[in-house]
Amino acid sequence: MAEFVEADNAEAIIARIETKSRKIESLLKQYKHVEALKTALEGSPPKTRDERCKSANWIVVHRALMAIKDIDGMLNALDVEYYDILMKYLYRGLSTGDRPTCDQCLKIHEKLTERAGLGCILRCLTDTINTV
């Protein structure tokens, strides 16, 4: 079972997410969109139940997701170990109801499902411990 940190450590997690956010912004300015997404997905989801941490991390992942233009190229460059966590964030994006976010998440979802198969969806939906 995953070990979760207590809420009093949430500030430390948020500080790490802020550092990650600055790195991602730098990568995006250099047009390294896939590298930014990989960086955003690293260490995700945060090992906490604190919603502030999860929301802060979602904002970082969302920023990287929205910058992706070449979905096939992104999936070719992305290691398969990232597929399940990416799928979780796609569902989080779909749950926002924001039209541009949903459109992007659906495009990526379609290509990711073709690549990773239905097992990726099932693992994402049945993992109730490591939520994003």
UniProtKB/Swiss-Prot annotation:
Q: Which residues carry this modification: N-acetylalanine?
A: 2
Specify where it is mainly localized: cytoplasm
PANTHER family per the record?
Answer: ARP2/3 COMPLEX 16 KD SUBUNIT P16-ARC (PTHR12644)
Q: Quick one: which gene encodes this?
A: ARPC5A
Tissue specificity: Expressed at low levels in all tissues with a relatively highest expression in inflorescences.
Q: Which cellular components does GO assign to this protein?
A: Arp2/3 protein complex; cell projection; cytoplasm
Family membership? Belongs to the ARPC5 family.
The beginning of the lineage is: Eukaryota, Viridiplantae, Streptophyta, Embryophyta, Tracheophyta
Q: Which GO terms describe its molecular function?
A: actin binding
Q: Which UniProt keywords apply?
A: Acetylation, Actin-binding, Cell projection, Cytoplasm, Cytoskeleton
Function noted in UniProt: Functions as a component of the Arp2/3 complex which is involved in regulation of actin polymerization and together with an activating nucleation-promoting factor (NPF) mediates the formation of branched actin networks. Arp2/3 complex plays a critical role in the control of cell morphogenesis via the modulation of cell polarity development.
Q: Fill in the subunit field for this protein.
A: Component of the Arp2/3 complex composed of ARP2, ARP3, ARPC1/p41-ARC, ARPC2/p34-ARC, ARPC3/p21-ARC, ARPC4/p20-ARC and ARPC5/p16-ARC.
Gene3D superfamilies under this entry?
Actin-related protein 2/3 complex subunit 5 (1.25.40.190)
The subcellular location is:
Cytoplasm, Cytoskeleton; Cell projection
Q: What Pfam families does the record tag this protein with?
A: P16-Arc
Q: What phenotype is described for loss of this gene?
A: Distorted trichomes and altered epidermal cell types.
**Protein known as:** Actin-related protein 2/3 complex subunit 5A
InterPro entries documented for this protein:
ARPC5, ARPC5_sf
Q: Which GO terms describe its biological process?
A: actin cytoskeleton organization; actin filament organization; actin filament polymerization; Arp2/3 complex-mediated actin nucleation; multidimensional cell growth; regulation of actin filament polymerization; trichome morphogenesis
